[in-house]
Design a protein with these regions (language model features):
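Conserved Walker A/P-loop ATP-binding site and its immediately adjacent core
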Residues: 2-26, 115-123, 423-430
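Inter-lobe coupling linker of SF2 helicases/translocases
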Residues: 37-68, 72-115, 122, 132-334, ...
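Conserved helix-turn-beta segment of the N-terminal RecA-like "Helicase ATP-binding" lobe
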Residues: 4, 13-37, 130-134, 435-444
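Conserved Helicase C-terminal RecA-like lobe
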Residues: 1-4, 209-227, 244, 249-490
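Short glycine-/polar-rich loops that comprise or flank the Walker A/P-loop
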Residues: 2-5, 33-36, 64-65, 103-107, ...
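Catalytic acidic motif of RecA-like/P-loop NTPases
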Residues: 74-81, 114-116, 295, 426-427, ...
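Conserved RecA-like P-loop NTPase helicase motor core
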Residues: 392, 437, 441-556
Length: 722
């Protein structure tokens, strides 16, 4: 009876995909298989009560699952720490403790297009879920000479050294030579990977459809407004740099003599994050977030300015009305996540913490109010400066209208009018929906929809059911099976405005035109968004990516973000002595982001190339083992085949004339430096000129080449054999 209890954990917006395949639904293509599994959301791990997807969380036995499938597992790549009795668990630790470690023995299957962002520790943290955070469990099962911790440490060290090489030396082959054999053995044991490039090159896609051709990306840099003598980006940035944002750090103003009263705020007590650290983290995020919001839209920036201004003014009012210490400040009132983008909302600053109150009598509220009043004055000035930028004078919005007009009048695929517009912020999505829906309806008779983290579905079609599944089905009817799901319905949506809540896992390839209305700070997000339409089986011959960039040089833009982070970091060190309060994503490698964002201005980068380094596609041999097992099922006589087999195939551009040798070392004990991954077999590719085209240390490349040369061929090429 093992493996009967299965849990699928996925982002909430992807639950319908999973529910379809287990339910008795007309659009379930595998209904006869009668799959049985529970579907819950990543966010449910932090919940103790209530209903979720028809399951009562109060009574759920989290520890009774034989298998847990984690969709979009990269959301758990930052890991977690356990220390002390009062350690507060983040989502990662909840999963580890409630599901994997508790109850019956649980196997873990993780699905992700981006398991590694820009460091190998991302992969290690995800793998730790499978071995319950106990490395000794994995070490016993691996055929390696080193522990898993040492393997990843050495791999990251090799990668760091390789990344500093000159560009012409920083090749995949060079990195493969420096990585330890045990690292390959580890990945080969636990990963199976496929990429777009790999499928296109080595697989026959005639049965499942092709990938569409990517047109060169369009990069646009509209100015802020067409108003004469109006404020520009640099004017706003200078004002933003003057903000202290101490509204987010009240605990820094607790008087030293009163600190003992608030020991929970100022000391770790085993927690990985103190309340002071959490406040500083939110303050730093908000300082950077103001830049992000401005780059997204004037409307989004204005709303955030107004919210912070109201928060400050309300707090100043509370201080002024303070009498005899009977007034307390509730910190949770000033730590809401609604102003932040999808990634920032998932940091521990918002998911970890408890209600804490500070008595104003215990604060140096005079100094605090002085700083608050300075910020209030500058925010009011900002508010006045952008007040005149209405939609009519919003150059970025008007540029978007021009794009839509051109796309409709000159479609890149015959008759296809569909457009997806992505933004990082729901406020920008609301602003775009209000204006784009009116423009598209009045000028072209097109229907528009919106999906955000808080809006499951909103559309201009009267009486259309406003839920995620219906909206996506009406927007991408072929890929979503509308003819089965909504038979007889003529409702169709042509423009979809969305946040990153649907940037993962959705098949929307009926659409051929995707606009990034704001460029996400994490370059991987940009490619994930484009992946909604850049999918195998697309009905479109061509697809187009459009990116809106800030109205300034990219280096200047990235340096600006660096200056803001540095300024906030200095203030953190001054107040707390701690310079490591922000999450790994936000620390980021600015050079990595700079390089990738520059590439994205000129080309559409494959997601496996986004690390400027290596894809796990370059490492694993698992797929060849699967090919071999399948071949042996069909050809049982392979065991009696004579030695010395050979054949002849035509050369190609990637495989010039020569010989690929597959040899066997008769001495099994000899494997120099333990570097040959397929010992005792050795492969080498020698060109017609006698040069080594590929040596035995890169069997993955040789096996890929052989597969490509032999694909679709059952007999030797007679012309070449004569």
């Amino acid at each position: 009876n093992r493996n009967k209890s299965v849990l699928v954990l996925c982002p909430k917006k992807l639950s319908e995909n999973w529910n379809t395949y287990k339910g008795n639904y007309i659009n379930n293509p595998i209904a006869t298989d009668r799959l049985r599994y529970d579907v819950l959301y990543h966010t449910d791990l932090s919940r103790e009560h209530g209903q979720s997807n028809g399951i009562d969380l109060d009574r759920l036995n989290w520890g009774n699952y034989d298998l847990v499938v984690i969709d979009e597992s990269h959301n758990f790549r930052n890991g977690g720490e356990v220390s002390g009795e009062d350690a507060k668990e983040n989502r990662y630790l909840k999963l580890l403790n409630k599901v994997v470690r508790a109850g019956v023995r649980t196997k873990v299957l993780m699905l992700s297009a981006t398991p590694v962002n820009n460091k190998f520790i991302d992969l290690k943290n995800q793998l730790a879920l499978a071995y319950e955070g106990d490395a000794s469990q994995m070490n016993k099962k691996l055929d390696t000479t080193k522990s898993i911790d040492e393997i990843f440490r050495q791999a990251q060290k090799a990668f760091n050294a390789w990344s500093k090489l000159p560009a012409d030396e920083r090749t995949t082959d060079e990195l493969l030579r420096t990585l330890d054999f045990d690292f390959f053995e580890l990945l080969d044991s636990v990963t199976i990977a496929r990429s777009r490039k790999h499928i296109e090159k080595y697989y026959n896609t005639s049965d499942i459809g092709k990938f569409p051709e990517r047109l060169p990306p369009i990069s646009l840099r509209p100015c802020l407004t067409d108003l004469n003598d109006a404020i520009n980006y640099n004017d706003i940035y200078n004002l933003l740099m003057s903000l202290s944002l101490t509204i987010y750090t009240p605990s820094n103003y607790i008087m030293p003599s009163k600190l003992a009263k608030y020991i929970d705020i100022t000391h770790h007590k085993g927690n990985s994050l103190t309340q002071q650290g959490r406040e500083e983290g939110i303050r730093r995020l908000m300082s950077i977030n103001l830049l992000k919001r401005l780059e997204s839209s004037v409307a989004s920036f204005r709303l955030t300015i107004d919210r912070i201004k109201k928060l400050i003014n309300d707090t100043i009012g509370t201080i002024k009305n303070y009498q005899s210490g009977d007034c307390v400040l509730n910190l949770t009132e000033i730590s809401g996540a609604e102003d932040f983008d999808y990634d920032d909302q998932n940091t521990d600053f918002f998911s970890v913490g408890k209600k804490i109150k500070i008595d104003l009598a215990d604060m140096d509220y005079v100094s605090w109010m002085r700083e608050l009043e300075k910020d209030a004055e500058n925010l009011e000035l900002l508010s006045v400066m952008i007040a005149d930028i209405t939609p009519e004078h919003d150059t970025k919005l008007q540029t978007l209208f021009d794009l839509i007009r051109k796309k409709i009048e000159q479609p890149i695929n015959p008759g296809n009018k569909k457009i997806i517009i992505f933004t990082a912020f729901s406020d920008t999505a609301d602003y775009l929906f209000a204006n784009v829906s009116k423009f598209a309806k009045e000028n072209f008779g097109l229907e528009t929809a919106e999906i955000t983290g808080t809006v499951d579905g909103k559309a201009t079609i009267p009486k259309l059911r406003a839920d995620l599944n219906t909206v996506l089905t009406c927007f991408s009817p072929v890929s979503k099976g509308k003819s089965v799901l909504l038979p007889g319905s003529t409702d169709e949506l042509d423009i979809l405005i969305a946040t990153d809540c649907i940037s993962e896992g959705q098949n929307l390839q009926d659409c051929d035109y995707l606009i990034n209305y704001d460029v996400h700070w994490n370059p991987v997000r940009i490619i994930q968004r484009f992946g909604r339409i850049d999918r195998i089986g697309s009905k479109n011959d061509h697809i187009q990516l459009v990116n809106f960039w800030p109205d300034m040089d990219l280096d200047e833009y990235i340096n600006l973000k660096s200056r803001v982070e540095t300024r906030m970091k200095i203030s953190v060190m001054t107040s707390t002595g701690d310079d490591d309060l922000i999450n790994a994503e936000e620390k980021g490698d600015l050079e990595y982001r700079r390089a990738q964002l520059k590439r994205l201005q000129e080309e559409v980068v494959d997601i496996e190339d986004m690390t400027s380094g290596i894809s796990i596609m370059d490492l694993g041999l698992n797929e060849f083992r699967l090919d071999l097992l399948e071949y042996m099922k069909r050809h049982e006589d392979i065991e009696t085949a004579p030695k010395g087999l050979h054949t002849v195939v035509a050369q190609t551009e990637d495989a010039p004339a020569g010989v690929i040798f597959v040899l066997r070392n008769i001495n099994n004990s000899v494997n120099i430096d333990n570097r040959n991954r397929i010992h005792p077999f050795y492969m080498v590719y020698i060109s017609e000129e006698g040069e080594i085209a590929c040596d035995y240390l890169n069997p993955k490349r040789l096996l890929d080449t052989m597969r490509l040369l032999c694909r679709g061929k059952g007999e030797p090429c007679a012309e070449l054999c004569t």
